[in-house]
Each structure stands twice: as structure tokens, then as C-alpha cells.
């Protein structure tokens, strides 16, 4: 096993075959999920009752096992979560990979000895994020994939300055999400399938059309504008080792055993200094699974390289180019490696003139049924089975190798290579004096629920006439444990000198000891002591105590005054429109979320004294290791308070003024809400947008509803990403240093296959947010929310002009005070919005509200 100073190779396992493949190819640790509470619900996953068997199998081979618990946990699931925590502890899981801070708190209460690793779903991009995870009890953190090598170096230095020794884990291979993990709401908003719940719908892999200033932009064959190439940091391993990264993680719990075997072996050999042929390794990895391999963000931001936009499905290595073809279906190729019958290839067809840009171009491919070698790196092939339509082919088209039976056979053998259990250590003690039997005692492991194992020789020790018993002879005979699964680790000897016992008797004693160990249940697969199982009432009591502490001892007292709005504006004209309203009493406070730092002081000056809770400022959702400067304009503006969105803002801004927490903090249960309030003194939090109406009401009933703020109207942020589409497709640059800032000159939307155009914005750090083109309104649920005791309702503006701003505020304010029925507001919103509005996450789904967790 690796320790903190030796990089760990961590491989994925979605089933037993993948788990065994990872171990066969040298993984130090494996991460996997059970049927609920993990971020890959589409994987086969394991059953909870198999957890003990999995861990015994791994531990017998010297491999660690990490259980993924990397989702948000809803209020009504906490009891089930507690049961899984206890089960993981019972099974001797080496660590839980977690996202939910409330779950961390529950784990510390129930299973304090179980290690916690902060998931990449925690969106950790800075030293403040690492420190927050440490405060929550994490012993390791998985960093966001968006950090470059230079960011990792800077982060390590910042952690040293804080004297925080936290092992860091980074992804080195596999699929890349275009959005920050833990911050993607696309599946939730468009299909009520939350990525924060393991149900990502892969909307980033779909085609989109860029609409610039109202006109569709012709991007030729670039349709997959949000689909990154896959990550392959094989060549960067030496530098990552030098940076002191503790664990290298391979993505792929949805992949098969051959992928896991090929990827694990490649990185194992690179870590061990055994790799010698980079081209062969790249082909090995491309055949495993590849949408095109890149270094992701590790070598710095290059938006044009990260997303090529031409395809989003699996393709293997490029093996040639098309030279010509004929009516009989023969394709003449210039090839980079010899092809064989039975292999699969694919070529791209040129789209027809006037073809729908949101319809993927045709692919021409199949199995090679016939092959003629033409010499000099040329061949001709016919594809099948059946007749292949070659319409749309173009000379010079690339040829990808998508399947290779020989590769599959080779890696199937590698994936199923047997791995014998390691011999586990035995500690023994022998005692003896002349004239008495020799005593043999098992020191470690100790049988549970049985007396210590001791046995005696059947004959007494005698005076030796030749060489007597000594440590060497005893170790030689008692250590003959080959094939038993045990090895002699230590032997304590308390013997008088020059004593004799027949070798046959020593051998008998060894065999008898092993038999008695088996009777006591001490087998190599169960050598670790079993932990006592806490009774169900103990678990229930611990959970009840946590929830009671989160709710607080004092009775809930409704806030004085009528429920009111908190309005979030994204422009100064919107702010000025609010100030000009005839009824300022409709609004409790305003949040200004402005891209330009130069506008912040102006916004504060305009809003000062206008509303009871004043004007608060909101910062970016992400702060990288070199971006502390982005917080300083917020500080210098001296607002009445802040809407905080990440750990850096919590650290920097909460000491300065009243703060509330935004949805990006991922508050889904009372324990998380209580953690943020007590740790940072937040006056309110906006719950995670992954909660539907019923789950939001559950949260309100389990805490003080005065601590919650509900967003009644918004354009849901779909993707929040480091990738900048303005730079990638509207400039010849690679990042913010040479892009020319097209984001300041153009209005951009992405049109999806249903015709909806989704607005795109860039923040101060050049990160892009794609908003849902259809607004979400929870106004129909307003009566239920008011009955639950909620009093603060956010209205988020996006690109409304001043007139639309005032009309929307007036409409929702009148709904709050009861002068307009909620159903009427919903109907008016359907009319006012060109695309109508959606209930989105604030829908009620009744008894099925917890999706697949309890299935």
C-alpha cells in the first residue's frame, strides 16, 4: 500500500469485473459505489450487502477501498444515509468520498473513525476550499479538474503557509465535465435529473448552435460546443509527482473492465518508471475509450484545444486518411498502421448544403470485411456487414479505429488475470522450560468472542545433546505457512537454553494452531477484528441529536412583518428601476451581481438606505488559487452585506458585514444549513436548486424557516464552466490574454435541438454561465411556501430592461401580499415570456420525490 509520500493510483470500479481488473493491473486503491447515494447511478454498482465481501477481497490483496457517497443528501434521507455510514464502517471501508457537509457532520457523530475524502463535487479550487473541507472533517480532498499544474503548485504553497497538511487528489485520466463538478444544474433544470444526485443526462454532449447578436453563426462542422475531449495526463505524471500530489485518480465507473485494465496499467507503469513507448501507450488509452485525448486544463487554459466541437462520441486513434472510393464500396486509404479484417473503422461524412446544424453529421463506418494491402502504407478495404452508404465522403477524411478484436482479447485477458491474496501477518509467542511441554500462543490476530489461542506440545522439552532449539529453528518450522494465507510476522521466544523438541512435534503444533484459528473464524479474509454493530436505536438517537442541534433549542418565532422580496439585479439600469418603484416596501433587500468591478461602488451608492436589508454584493461562484484579487473590489465597495458563493468569500467577507449563502453552497438538509450558520454566521441560505418543492418543504420543517431564502423566479444557471465559448469560437485567441474580449462586444446564446436559445454570460474571471432560456417560476407553490413559514423570496433578473424589471417585481410582490392569486401570476408569466415559464425544480412530485434512493 502507498502512504502519503508515495503517490497512490486510484482506479474506478462500476462492477466486480472492473474492480478485479483494477487490482490485477496494480491499482493501490479502488473507488466504487453501492446502489444509492453515489454520483454514478447509471453504473451497475454494487449491492450494500456485498460491501463486506468487497472490502475483505481488496484488503486480502493489500488494496484500499473507497466508497463513493458523493451526492447531496435530502432531509428525508438522513436516516438511510446514517445506516449506510454504519454499514461502511462495519465493512472496514477505508474512506468515504463525500460531497455533503451535513453528511460529514453526521459521519463524525456516528462513525468518527471512518476517514472522509472531499469529493470533486465540493468544487474545491483554492486553499480556502481545502481548509473548509478540513474543518468539516475531511482527511483528503479531490481537487477540481479545472486547476492547472501552476495552480496546483501555488495551492501547495498556500497550504504550507496555512500550515495545513492536506493530501491532495487529482484526476489524471478520463471524461471531463465542461461544468465545474458540483455546480452543474443542467440535468436538473432541463430534465429533473440532478448531476448532484448521480443522474447526469450528459447535455454537454449534445449539439448546439451559437447565435451571436441575433444571427446564427456558421461554425462549419463544429456542433458540440460544450463537449470537451477526454483527459490524459500520462505525460504529466512526473511533474505531478514532483508537486507532491498524494493520489492520481482515473475516471470511469461507467466504463468496462478492459478500459479499467488498460488505463490502470498505463499509469501504473508510468508511476513505476517502466513505460518506454509513449505512442504505444497513447494508442492503448485511445482504444480503451476516447473522445480525443488532451491534457485538459493541466497545461493551462486553451479553450480552442479543450473543445474541438466536431464530435462527442467515442472514437479511437486516427489510423489513416481516405484517398478515394468507388461504386463497389472499396475505400483506398493511406494508413499509419496495418489494418486487419474484423477491425471497426469510422469516417465522417460531409454535411449536406443547407443541412440542419443541430443534426449530427452522418458517420460512415463498420467492420472491415475485405482488405487488400497495396504497399507503401496504402490499402483498400470494404466495410460491412451489408452494403454501406458512402454518400458524403470526402477525400482526405480521417479514418478512426473504433474497434479491434485483438486489442479486446488482449485486454480481456489482462482484466481477468488472477490476483492471489497476500499472506497476512501472524504474531506468535513460545515459552518453555526443561521437563515441561512447549507452549505456543497466538498473539495477533486475536479471536473475537473466544479465549486466547494457546496449545502445548504433547511431549516435554528435554535437554539437547546436540544443537538446541533457538529462534532460527523455531522460525523455520513455525513459519512454514505457504498456501495458508498467513505469514510469520514476529515470534517472541522465552526459552531456556539447550532444549530439544522433535521437528515433527513443532510441525504438528503449527498445523493444530491453524486448525483452531479456522474454528474460531480467523481466516485470512476475516483477520481484522469485527466492529461491534450499534443497535438501531443508537443510530436513531445520534441522528435525532444532530437534527435537534441543527434546529436549535429555541422555538421558531416568525419574522415580524409581511413576507418580502429579495431582488437580484445584474445591471445598473435594473437597480435604478427598483429605486424608482412606487412601493419600495415590497422589497426587503437587493443583491447586485455585476460583472464589472468599476460598477460596484456606484451600485452601493445608489442602493444605500433604500431597503431595510440594504444592498448586498455578490461575487463569482469560483475563486482559483491566484484570484484572491477578485474579492477586493467587493471589499472596497463597502456594501451593506454580501451574498457569498464559495469558501474564499466565506473566509474573506463574513467578518466584514452580514452575509447570506447562495445556492452554490449546496445546502440540501438541516445539518448542512446548521454547519454554515454556526461556522460562518450566515443569516440565511438559499437551498440547493436540486431540491424540488416537497424536499424544500421538508428542509423548512426540519430547521428554522427564517434561515432560508427561496428563489421564486429565475433563469436557472445550467453550466458554470471554466471553458469560455466567446474565446473558443469568436476569437483566434486561446485565453483571456489574447482573445480580444468578445464577451464585451457581443450577445451570445446557444440554441438547442428544441429551438430554445440559452443566454451565455462571462464573469470577472472569464468563466461562462449558460442560463436556461426558459425562466423558472415557483409562484404556484407560494401558498405552500408561506404556510411553511418562509418569509424571504428571491426574484432573480437576467437581461430584463427597466420596464420589465418593474413589472416583474410588482407582479410577484402582489402575489406575496395576496392581492393577485398565484395561479394568475403563473398565467401572466406564461404570456410575458416568449418561451413561457417552467416550474423546473420547484415542482411537486409527491410520494416519488426521493427518486431512486429508496428503490
Question: Model-derived features: where do they sit?
Answer:
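Active-site pocket-lining/capping segments in soluble small-molecule metabolic enzymes
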Residues: 2-124, 128, 150-247, 254-398, ...
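His/Asp/Glu-rich metal-coordinating catalytic cores
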Residues: 144
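Long, basic N-terminal domains or extensions that often function
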Residues: 139-140, 406
Amino acid at each position: 500500500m502507498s502512504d502519503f509520500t508515495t503517490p497512490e493510483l486510484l482506479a474506478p470500479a462500476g462492477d466486480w469485473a472492473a474492480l478485479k481488473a483494477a487490482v490485477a493491473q496494480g491499482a493501490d486503491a479502488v473507488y466504487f459505489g453501492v446502489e444509492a447515494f453515489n454520483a454514478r447511478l447509471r453504473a451497475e454498482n454494487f449491492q450494500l450487502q456485498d460491501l463486506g465481501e468487497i472490502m475483505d477481497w481488496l484488503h486480502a490483496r493489500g488494496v484500499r477501498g473507497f466508497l463513493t457517497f458523493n451526492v447531496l443528501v435530502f432531509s428525508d434521507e438522513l436516516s438511510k444515509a446514517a445506516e449506510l455510514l454504519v454499514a461502511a464502517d462495519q465493512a472496514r471501508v477505508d474512506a468515504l468520498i463525500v460531497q455533503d457537509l451535513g453528511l460529514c457532520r453526521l459521519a463524525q457523530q456516528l462513525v468518527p473513525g471512518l476517514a472522509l475524502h472531499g469529493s470533486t463535487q465540493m468544487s474545491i479550487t483554492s486553499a480556502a476550499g481545502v481548509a473548509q473541507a478540513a474543518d468539516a472533517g475531511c482527511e483528503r480532498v479531490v481537487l477540481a479538474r479545472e486547476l492547472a499544474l501552476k495552480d496546483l503548485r501555488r495551492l501547495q504553497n498556500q497550504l504550507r503557509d496555512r500550515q495545513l497538511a492536506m493530501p491532495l487528489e487529482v484526476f489524471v485520466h478520463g471524461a471531463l465535465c465542461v461544468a465545474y463538478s458540483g455546480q452543474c444544474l443542467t440535468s436538473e433544470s432541463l430534465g429533473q435529473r440532478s448531476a448532484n444526485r448521480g443522474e447526469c443526462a450528459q447535455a454537454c454532449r449534445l449539439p448546439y448552435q451559437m447565435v451571436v447578436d441575433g444571427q446564427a453563426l456558421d461554425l462549419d462542422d463544429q456542433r458540440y460546443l460544450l463537449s470537451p475531449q477526454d483527459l490524459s495526463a500520462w505525460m504529466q505524471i512526473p511533474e505531478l509527482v514532483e508537486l507532491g500530489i498524494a493520489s492520481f485518480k482515473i475516471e470511469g465507473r461507467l466504463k468496462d473492465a478492459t478500459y479499467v485494465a488498460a488505463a490502470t496499467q498505463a499509469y501504473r507503469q508510468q508511476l513505476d518508471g517502466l513505460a518506454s513507448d509513449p505512442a504505444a501507450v497513447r494508442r492503448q488509452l485511445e482504444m480503451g475509450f476516447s473522445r480525443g485525448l488532451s491534457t485538459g486544463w493541466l497545461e493551462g487554459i486553451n479553450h480552442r484545444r479543450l473543445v474541438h466541437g466536431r464530435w462527442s462520441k467515442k472514437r479511437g486513434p486516427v489510423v489513416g486518411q481516405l484517398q478515394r472510393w468507388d461504386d463497389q464500396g472499396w475505400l483506398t486509404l493511406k494508413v499509419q498502421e496495418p489494418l486487419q479484417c474484423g477491425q471497426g473503422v469510422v469516417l465522417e461524412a460531409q454535411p449536406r448544403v443547407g443541412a440542419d446544424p443541430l443534426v449530427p453529421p452522418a458517420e460512415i463506418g463498420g467492420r472491415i470485411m475485405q482488405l487488400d494491402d497495396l504497399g507503401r502504407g496504402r490499402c483498400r478495404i470494404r466495410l460491412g456487414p451489408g452494403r454501406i452508404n458512402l454518400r458524403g465522403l470526402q477525400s482526405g477524411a480521417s479514418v478512426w479505429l473504433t474497434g479491434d478484436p485483438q486489442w479486446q482479447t488482449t485486454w480481456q485477458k489482462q482484466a481477468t488475470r488472477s490476483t492471489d491474496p497476500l499472506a497476512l501477518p501472524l504474531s506468535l509467542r513460545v515459552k518453555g522450560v526443561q521437563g515441561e511441554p512447549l507452549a505456543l500462543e497466538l498473539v495477533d490476530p486475536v479471536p473475537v468472542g473466544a479465549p486466547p489461542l494457546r496449545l502445548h506440545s504433547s511431549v516435554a522439552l528435554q535437554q539437547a545433546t546436540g544443537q538446541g532449539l533457538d529462534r532460527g529453528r523455531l522460525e523455520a518450522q513455525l513459519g512454514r505457512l505457504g498456501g495458508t494465507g498467513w505469514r510469520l510476522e514476529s515470534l517472541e521466544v522465552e526459552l531456556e537454553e539447550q532444549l530439544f523438541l522433535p521437528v515433527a512435534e513443532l510441525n504438528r503444533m503449527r498445523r493444530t494452531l491453524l486448525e483452531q484459528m479456522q474454528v474460531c473464524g480467523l481466516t485470512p479474509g476475516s483477520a481484522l477484528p469485527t466492529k461491534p454493530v450499534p443497535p438501531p436505536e443508537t443510530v436513531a438517537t445520534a441522528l435525532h441529536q444532530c437534527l435537534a442541534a441543527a434546529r436549535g433549542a429555541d422555538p421558531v418565532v416568525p419574522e415580524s412583518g409581511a413576507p418580502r422580496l429579495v431582488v437580484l439585479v445584474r445591471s445598473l439600469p435594473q437597480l435604478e428601476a427598483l429605486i424608482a418603484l412606487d412601493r419600495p416596501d415590497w422589497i426587503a433587500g437587493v443583491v447586485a451581481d455585476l460583472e464589472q468591478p468599476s460598477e460596484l461602488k456606484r451600485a452601493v451608492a445608489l442602493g444605500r438606505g433604500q431597503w431595510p436589508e440594504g444592498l448586498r454584493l455578490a461575487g463569482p461562484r469560483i475563486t482559483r488559487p491566484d484570484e484572491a484579487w477578485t474579492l477586493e473590489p467587493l471589499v472596497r465597495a463597502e456594501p451593506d452585506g454580501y451574498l457569498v458563493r464559495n469558501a474564499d468569500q466565506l473566509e474573506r467577507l463574513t467578518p466584514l458585514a452580514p452575509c447570506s449563502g447562495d445556492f452554490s453552497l449546496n445546502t440540501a438538509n438541516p445539518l448542512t444549513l446548521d454547519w454554515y450558520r454556526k461556522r460562518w454566521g450566515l443569516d440565511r441560505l438559499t437551498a440547493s436548486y436540486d431540491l424540488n418543492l416537497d424536499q424544500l418543504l421538508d428542509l423548512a420543517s426540519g430547521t428554522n424557516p427564517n434561515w432560508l431564502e427561496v428563489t421564486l423566479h429565475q433563469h436557472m444557471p445550467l453550466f458554470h464552466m471554466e471553458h469560455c465559448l466567446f474565446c473558443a469560437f469568436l476569437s483566434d485567441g486561446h485565453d483571456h490574454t489574447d482573445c480580444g474580449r468578445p464577451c464585451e462586444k457581443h450577445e451570445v446564446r446557444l440554441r438547442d435541438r428544441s429551438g430554445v436559445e440559452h443566454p451565455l454570460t462571462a464573469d470577472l474571471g472569464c468563466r461562462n454561465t449558460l442560463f436556461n432560456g426558459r425562466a423558472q417560476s415557483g409562484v404556484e407553490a407560494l401558498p405552500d411556501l408561506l404556510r411553511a413559514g418562509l418569509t424571504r423570496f428571491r426574484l432573480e433578473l437576467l437581461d430584463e430592461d427597466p420596464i420589465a424589471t418593474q413589472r416583474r417585481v410588482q407582479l410577484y410582490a402582489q402575489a406575496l401580499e395576496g392581492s393577485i392569486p398565484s395561479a394568475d401570476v403563473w398565467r401572466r408569466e406564461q404570456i410575458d415570456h416568449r418561451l413561457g415559464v417552467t416550474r423546473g425544480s420547484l415542482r411537486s412530485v409527491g410520494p416519488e420525490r426521493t427518486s431512486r434512493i429508496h428503490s
